[in-house]
Structures are given as C-alpha cells and as structure tokens.
Amino acid sequence: MSTQNTPRFATIRLNDRGAWRPIAVTSFSEEGGEGKLLAEFPYKEQVTSTELDSLPTVSFTADQLGPVVPNPGKIFCVGLNYREHIAEMGHPIPDHPTLFVKYASALAGPFDEVVVPPELSAQADYEGELAVIMGEFGQIAGYTVMNDFSQRDWQYRTQQWLQGKNLDRSSGFGPWMVPTEHFDPIAEGAVLRTWVNGELRQEHSVADLVFKPQDLVDYISNFASLAPGDVIVTGTPEGVGHGMTPPQYLADGDEVRIAIDGIGEIRNRINC
C-alpha cells in the first residue's frame, strides 16, 4: 500500500512566525522533500495533474511539515472504538460513539518534539489513530495519522477526559492527507502500527473499528455541522502503555512512531 503514486497534501511552515502554506507533496525522504505550492488546501475539490505541473516547486525539510490541518474549526475524538482496546480498558462495547474534543492548540507537526512539563509527565501515553479530514457537504476529503497524546492521571481525574487530551502541541498530526478518492483504509484493511523506541506496541487493522469513519460522520452530523478541514480522530487499538501490566508510560527521550499502511508515518520524540 505505497503512497508514492498517490496524491498527498500537506502543510509546511514557511517561517518561525506561524506562516503556513499547503503543498502537494511530490517526493519525500527522512531528510525532507519537494512539493508544489498550493493557494489553498484541497478540501473542496481535487487538484489535477495538469494544474500541479503549472505550480511552483518548493523544497522543504521534514521538520518544516506542520499539522496537516493547522487550525481545524472542530476536532472530534472517539474513545473506545476497537474491541480489544475496550477490553483492555475494562469497558463494555458501547451502543454509541464516545466523543470528546481536542483543540487545535494541542496539534503538533508529524516530526515535532513534544515538550511535556515535568509536573504533567507522570502518566504520559500514546494512542496511534486514523484521522479523517472533512471536505464539503459532509463528505470525507481524506485520511491521515494522529497520536492522540494522553496524560492518564489528568484524563481520569473526572469522568470527562478533556483535561488529559489537550496539552499544547502534543498530538503529532500528519504527515499529509491522502484523498479518499485514491485510498480507502477501511476497504483496504490498512494496518495501524505504533512503536516506542523501536518496540512494536500496537498493530491492528483499521477495518476493525466498531464505528467506521462514515458512521462517525453520520452520527456527529446529527448535532454539529462538519465543515471543510474539520477532523474526526477515530480511536486507538489495544496496546497503549496504560493498559499494560505494569503500565508503561512515556519517559524523557522516548520516540513514538505511528504508521498506517497506504498513508504514511509520524515520529515524535518526548521531552520532559
């Protein structure tokens, strides 16, 4: 499930003052890549190959890649959406999606360092997830990868999880969007994998989601309008550090790598 010949749309940082620019990625390696500068991110309609050929080419380094959508209006996250993860967390299979929100300030680039204040780092955890990016008219524009970074001690202070899911610049998001016209991770049975310092922790097909992406779009649309660029983060499979015996939380210097077949991978090092 290579993405080499599949359109990939990302966002790069042009400078340190928060200037962003969407690009169509044409090549990429660990060091960086090249892409075509776009006037706007293609949430609404696809860019043709003829249009891309006429656009200026830009080179970029890996650390210039920002959150694939830098400032989404809404980010809905889903908890407890894989049966094995539900079991390891000790919950029954839900009748309806368990939803919480993440703010845009919690997003990080796909290769950014994640800085966790020492007083907030006691139970830092990873959650590899498939993320959905919305287009127009309630349609899914494409798919990407997210680490729903979690602070378990804060998450479980109350029955509401928000305070354990929104640390500033903590959730790696990217590296790019693969359009739904070219790739369906559910139909393809794409496998999500998470490694911590090279050790495989999560490995599961996203086809096993209890509530599939379109189910989530339909459910959320009952009470909220989904606009182009809004994000739905679909949940994590079993293998999180909190569910291990004993729990294995993230520590200073740990590298979390998350990959989904047919989309790409993100890598974030923890600094606490």
Q: What function would you assign to each model-found segment?
A:
Residues 1-97, 257:
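N-terminal non-catalytic cap/leader segment that marks the start of a structured domain
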Residues 2-7, 68, 85, 115, ...:
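Catalytic-pocket segment enriched in acidic/His residues
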Residues 93-110, 124-126, 251-262:
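Structural signature of FAD isoalloxazine-binding scaffolds in flavoprotein oxidoreductases
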Residues 105, 135-138, 149, 180-183, ...:
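Short loop segments at secondary-structure junctions
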Residues 110-131:
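A structural-propensity feature for long, helix-poor, extended segments
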Residues 127-129, 133-135, 140-149:
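RNA pseudouridine synthases
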